Curated annotation (Swiss-Prot):
Keywords: Electron transport, Membrane, Mitochondrion, Mitochondrion inner membrane, NAD, Respiratory chain, Translocase, Transmembrane, Transmembrane helix, Transport, Ubiquinone
Family note: Belongs to the complex I subunit 1 family.
Cross-referenced InterPro entries: NADH_UbQ_OxRdtase_su1/FPO, NADH_UbQ_OxRdtase_su1_CS
Coiled-coil regions, chain positions: none
Major enzyme class: translocase
Species annotation: Hipposideros armiger terasensis (Formosan leaf-nosed bat)
Catalytic activity: a ubiquinone + NADH + 5 H(+)(in) = a ubiquinol + NAD(+) + 4 H(+)(out)
EC numbers: 7.1.1.2
A cellular component term, taken from the record's GO annotations: mitochondrial inner membrane
Gene Ontology molecular function: NADH dehydrogenase (ubiquinone) activity
Protein name: NADH-ubiquinone oxidoreductase chain 1
GO biological process: mitochondrial electron transport, NADH to ubiquinone; mitochondrial respiratory chain complex I assembly
Membrane-protein topology: Multi-pass membrane protein
Length: 318
């Protein structure tokens, strides 16, 4: 039964990822006053399927000097971790109801660094290695603020369990009292998933294509799937943390519809940002984090620690 549940989760994720690539190309197309893919199938709807067939039927090329096992393991690890992170997400019922769901997600997102590092190192190409090192530095740096913001939100909800956040937000979304955290969280998720304007790892002008420059066909498709699965997952996480949908146990479908709509809007805003903003310079990216976000998040975290203690002694006003 568990295997069926697992498949029922993985297959829709992969389908969502496939069509997210199409949505992205359409959104970018319309924002640049053109049509986007419109040849394969009606309105280009079969484009992701054509892409998948093309990628998985290509011969998987491998550089002669690369280390084989790591080179093949890296994309598999990337996709496995990307899919594993979905297990504790309440939609409204999680696949595995974990006691420390939030901690698990942080740990998994930290492990994702290894797949990038291995792929860059195993490719034995200087461009791939530079791209991988950039990606790792960026991911590790932005995880610091993500962890502090999560801690502040946890101080409001009072539990590491994700479904508790739904209960916390029955009366008011957490984006209302802690909107500065939500803004910084959104920008940090952009950086964490290596999306524009933080896609320095894929700087075509200077690094060809970043850490996956030597990959082609199937392994490249796995990296691609992992990246987009992470994007959707991060937006779902944002929805759970700051835009909690109302959950009525008698009609869980309503929660799912509400939740999916919010997540989709956030995902489209990711694509919107990509179409609108130019890429950051690397030093600006690091300064933004270490000199702006980190002091701010630490101060706000202290605020979230002290406020409940200060207001605990205030008698109820009703």
């Amino acid at each position: 039964m568990f295997m069926i549940n697992l498949l029922m989760m993985i297959v829709p994720i992969l389908l969502a990822v496939a069509f997210l690539t199409l949505v992205e190309r359409k959104v970018l197309g319309y924002m640049q006053l053109r049509k986007g893919p419109n040849v394969v199938g009606p309105y280009g709807l079969l484009q992701p399927i054509a892409d998948a067939i093309k990628l998985f039927t290509k011969e998987p090329l491998r550089p002669l000097t690369s280390s084989i096992s790591m080179f093949i393991m890296a994309p598999i690890l990337a996709l496995t971790l990307a899919l594993t992170m979905w297990t504790p997400l309440p939609m409204p019922y999680p696949l595995i109801n974990m006691n420390l769901g939030i901690l698990f997600m942080l740990a998994m997102s930290s492990l994702a660094v290894y797949s990038i590092l291995w792929s860059g190192w195993a490719s034995n190409s200087k461009y791939a290695l530079i791209g991988a090192l950039r990606a790792v530095a960026q991911t590790i740096s932005y995880e610091v603020t993500l962890a502090i913001i999560l801690l502040s939100v946890l101080l409001l909800s009072g539990s590491f369990t994700l479904p508790t956040l739904i209960t916390t937000q029955e009366h008011i979304w957490l984006i209302v009292p802690s909107w500065p955290l939500a803004m910084m969280w959104f920008i940090s998720t952009l950086a964490e998933t290596n999306r524009a304007p933080f896609d320095l790892t894929e700087g075509e002008s200077e690094l060809v294509s970043g850490f996956n420059v030597e990959y082609a066909g199937g392994p490249f498709a796995l990296f691609f799937l992992a990246e987009y699965a992470n994007i959707i997952m991060m937006n779902i996480f944002t929805t759970i943390l700051f835009l909690g949908a109302f959950h009525n146990p008698l009609m869980p479908e309503l929660y799912t519809i509400n939740f999916v709509t919010k997540s989709m809007l956030l995902t489209i805003s990711f694509l919107w940002v990509r179409a609108s903003y130019p890429r950051f310079r690397y030093d600006q990216l690091m300064h933004l984090l270490w000199k702006n976000f980190l002091p701010l998040t630490l101060a706000l975290c202290m605020w979230h620690v002290t406020m409940p203690i200060i207001t605990a002694g205030v008698p109820p006003l009703t």
